C-alpha cells in the first residue's frame, strides 16, 4: 500500500491546498493511506472533517519572534523526535509540505530519513519555511513562475495552486448581459478596510444599478449588515434580485463566481487561483501586511497579464473607487478581455497534477 504524508498548518491558504492534493491523490490511487501532520492551528479540525488521520506536533514561528526565538532549539528538538517517530511508524513513500512553520520539521525529518520529499509554494514570494526546504527537497511545485530563482530550476515545476474542482465550472456559466454584479471578497476572515471602502461607495454603486454581494467575515458581519440596511432604508427595491447581499462566509464559491461580473478582493494565492480558474476579471486590493508583501506581488502578476487591476490599500482614500468599479462594469468588452486573460493564467487541475507527481515519486521511491 502506498503511503503519503502531507504537512502544513496555520492558515487556510496553506491547509486547503494540502487537503485538495490529499483528496486528489486518494481519488487517483484507491487504497492510498494518507496522514496529515500539522501544528495546533485549524488544520487538525479541517483534516478531521476531510476524514484524514491527524498528528499534531509542537510548532511555533521563529522568523521575527525576537528573544522568543531563543527557545526554538528546545521545541524543535522535541518536534523532530516526535516527527521522526511518526514517520518511522507510518513508513511513508513520499512526504509533501505546503508551507507554514508547522510544515517544516516533518519534511526536514523525512529528508534526513531518506524518504522522498516535496514542497508546494502558494505565493509569488516564498515563505521562510519553503525557502529553506526548497534547497534540499526532491521536488518543488509552485503556483507562480519562480522568476527570482529561489528554487533549483531542475527540481521545480509550476503546477498551480490546488482549488475545489467546482470552481472551474464557473467559467462556463451562461453570461448575463446587461447586469452589473460586484462580488466583494476579503478572504475567509473578511477585510475591514475593504468592507469600509465598499460601504462608503454603496449608495453610488446602487444608483448606477450595481448589485453587490459582499463576504464581510464573521467578525465584521453585524456591523456591515447594519450599514447596508441603513443605506437601503428608504430606497425603492428594483427588480426581483436583491440590490445588496451581505454574508459572513460564502460556502458555495462556485455559484458566487458564476454570479459575478467583477470580483473585488484581496490577493491571496487561493483567491487568485479561484478567480483565474473561474475566468473572472478582478480589482485587487492586496493585504499590505502580508509576509514579505507577497499579496502585492501576486496581484502584480495578474495585472501584468491584463487579468486584473491592482490598487494599494493606502491609495484607497484618494481613489475614485466607485468610478473605477462602475467604469469596469460599464465596459463589457474590457471585462471579457480581462476574463479571458484570467483564464490564460489558470491552472485548474493543480490538485490532480501535484497528486500525480507525488504518486510517481512514491512509485520510484527506491530509485532516489
UniProtKB/Swiss-Prot annotation:
<dbReference type="GO" id="GO:0051991">
    <property type="term" value="F:UDP-N-acetyl-D-glucosamine:N-acetylmuramoyl-L-alanyl-D-glutamyl-meso-2,6-diaminopimelyl-D-alanyl-D-alanine-diphosphoundecaprenol 4-beta-N-acetylglucosaminlytransferase activity"/>
</dbReference>
<keyword id="KW-0133">Cell shape</keyword>
<feature type="binding site">
    <location>
        <position position="188"/>
    </location>
    <ligand>
        <name>UDP-N-acetyl-alpha-D-glucosamine</name>
    </ligand>
</feature>
<dbReference type="Pfam" id="PF03033">
    <property type="entry name" value="Glyco_transf_28"/>
</dbReference>
<keyword id="KW-0328">Glycosyltransferase</keyword>
<keyword id="KW-0808">Transferase</keyword>
<dbReference type="GO" id="GO:0005975">
    <property type="term" value="P:carbohydrate metabolic process"/>
</dbReference>
<dbReference type="GO" id="GO:0030259">
    <property type="term" value="P:lipid glycosylation"/>
</dbReference>
<keyword id="KW-0997">Cell inner membrane</keyword>
<dbReference type="GO" id="GO:0051301">
    <property type="term" value="P:cell division"/>
</dbReference>
<feature type="binding site">
    <location>
        <position position="295"/>
    </location>
    <ligand>
        <name>UDP-N-acetyl-alpha-D-glucosamine</name>
    </ligand>
</feature>
<keyword id="KW-0961">Cell wall biogenesis/degradation</keyword>
<dbReference type="GO" id="GO:0071555">
    <property type="term" value="P:cell wall organization"/>
</dbReference>
<dbReference type="InterPro" id="IPR007235">
    <property type="entry name" value="Glyco_trans_28_C"/>
</dbReference>
<feature type="binding site">
    <location>
        <begin position="11"/>
        <end position="13"/>
    </location>
    <ligand>
        <name>UDP-N-acetyl-alpha-D-glucosamine</name>
    </ligand>
</feature>
<feature type="binding site">
    <location>
        <position position="123"/>
    </location>
    <ligand>
        <name>UDP-N-acetyl-alpha-D-glucosamine</name>
    </ligand>
</feature>
<comment type="similarity">
    <text>Belongs to the glycosyltransferase 28 family. MurG subfamily.</text>
</comment>
<keyword id="KW-0131">Cell cycle</keyword>
<feature type="binding site">
    <location>
        <position position="250"/>
    </location>
    <ligand>
        <name>UDP-N-acetyl-alpha-D-glucosamine</name>
    </ligand>
</feature>
<keyword id="KW-1003">Cell membrane</keyword>
<dbReference type="GO" id="GO:0009252">
    <property type="term" value="P:peptidoglycan biosynthetic process"/>
</dbReference>
<dbReference type="GO" id="GO:0005886">
    <property type="term" value="C:plasma membrane"/>
</dbReference>
<keyword id="KW-0132">Cell division</keyword>
<dbReference type="InterPro" id="IPR004276">
    <property type="entry name" value="GlycoTrans_28_N"/>
</dbReference>
<dbReference type="GO" id="GO:0008360">
    <property type="term" value="P:regulation of cell shape"/>
</dbReference>
<dbReference type="Pfam" id="PF04101">
    <property type="entry name" value="Glyco_tran_28_C"/>
</dbReference>
<keyword id="KW-0573">Peptidoglycan synthesis</keyword>
<comment type="pathway">
    <text>Cell wall biogenesis; peptidoglycan biosynthesis.</text>
</comment>
<feature type="binding site">
    <location>
        <position position="164"/>
    </location>
    <ligand>
        <name>UDP-N-acetyl-alpha-D-glucosamine</name>
    </ligand>
</feature>
<dbReference type="GO" id="GO:0050511">
    <property type="term" value="F:undecaprenyldiphospho-muramoylpentapeptide beta-N-acetylglucosaminyltransferase activity"/>
</dbReference>
<keyword id="KW-0472">Membrane</keyword>
<comment type="function">
    <text>Cell wall formation. Catalyzes the transfer of a GlcNAc subunit on undecaprenyl-pyrophosphoryl-MurNAc-pentapeptide (lipid intermediate I) to form undecaprenyl-pyrophosphoryl-MurNAc-(pentapeptide)GlcNAc (lipid intermediate II).</text>
</comment>
<protein>
    <recommendedName>
        <fullName>UDP-N-acetylglucosamine--N-acetylmuramyl-(pentapeptide) pyrophosphoryl-undecaprenol N-acetylglucosamine transferase</fullName>
        <ecNumber>2.4.1.227</ecNumber>
    </recommendedName>
</protein>
<dbReference type="InterPro" id="IPR006009">
    <property type="entry name" value="GlcNAc_MurG"/>
</dbReference>
Amino acid at each position: 500500500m502506498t503511503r503519503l504524508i502531507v504537512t502544513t498548518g496555520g492558515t487556510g491558504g496553506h491547509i486547503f491546498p494540502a487537503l485538495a492534493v490529499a483528496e486528489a491523490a486518494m481519488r487517483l490511487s484507491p487504497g492510498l493511506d494518507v496522514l496529515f501532520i500539522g501544528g495546533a492551528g485549524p488544520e487538525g479540525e479541517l483534516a478531521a472533517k476531510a476524514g484524514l488521520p491527524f498528528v499534531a506536533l509542537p510548532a511555533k514561528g521563529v522568523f521575527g519572534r525576537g528573544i522568543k526565538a531563543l527557545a526554538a532549539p528546545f521545541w524543535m528538538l522535541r518536534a523532530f523526535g516526535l516527527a521522526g517517530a511518526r514517520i518511522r511508524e507510518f513508513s511513508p513513500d513520499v512526504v509533501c509540505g505546503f508551507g507554514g512553520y508547522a510544515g517544516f520539521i516533518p519534511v526536514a525529518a523525512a529528508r534526513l530519513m531518506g524518504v522522498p520529499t516535496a514542497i508546494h509554494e502558494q505565493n509569488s514570494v516564498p515563505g521562510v519555511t519553503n525557502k529553506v526546504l526548497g534547497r534540499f527537497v526532491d521536488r518543488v511545485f509552485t503556483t507562480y513562475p519562480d522568476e527570482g530563482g529561489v528554487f533549483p530550476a531542475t527540481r521545480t515545476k509550476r503546477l498551480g495552486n490546488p482549488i475545489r474542482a467546482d470552481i472551474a465550472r464557473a467559467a462556463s456559466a451562461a453570461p448575463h448581459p446587461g447586469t452589473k454584479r460586484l462580488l466583494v471578497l476579503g478572504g475567509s476572515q473578511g477585510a475591514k478596510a475593504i468592507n469600509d471602502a465598499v460601504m462608503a461607495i454603496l449608495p453610488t454603486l446602487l444608483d448606477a444599478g450595481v448589485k453587490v454581494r459582499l463576504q464581510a467575515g464573521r467578525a465584521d458581519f453585524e456591523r456591515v449588515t447594519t450599514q447596508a440596511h441603513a443605506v437601503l432604508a428608504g430606497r425603492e427595491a428594483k427588480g426581483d434580485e436583491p440590490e445588496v447581499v451581505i454574508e459572513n462566509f460564502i460556502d458555495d464559491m462556485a455559484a458566487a463566481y458564476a454570479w459575478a461580473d467583477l470580483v473585488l478582493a484581496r490577493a491571496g494565492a487561493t483567491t487568485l487561483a479561484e478567480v483565474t480558474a473561474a475566468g473572472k476579471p478582478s480589482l485587487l486590493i492586496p493585504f499590505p501586511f502580508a509576509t514579505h508583501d507577497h499579496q502585492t506581488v501576486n496581484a502584480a502578476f495578474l495585472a501584468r497579464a491584463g487579468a486584473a487591476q491592482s490598487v494599494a490599500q493606502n491609495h484607497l482614500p484618494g481613489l475614485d473607487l466607485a468610478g473605477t468599479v462602475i467604469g469596469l462594469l460599464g465596459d463589457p468588452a474590457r471585462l471579457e478581455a480581462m476574463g479571458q486573460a484570467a483564464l490564460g493564467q489558470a491552472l485548474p487541475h493543480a490538485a490532480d497534477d501535484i497528486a500525480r507527481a507525488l504518486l510517481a515519486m512514491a512509485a520510484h521511491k527506491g530509485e532516489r
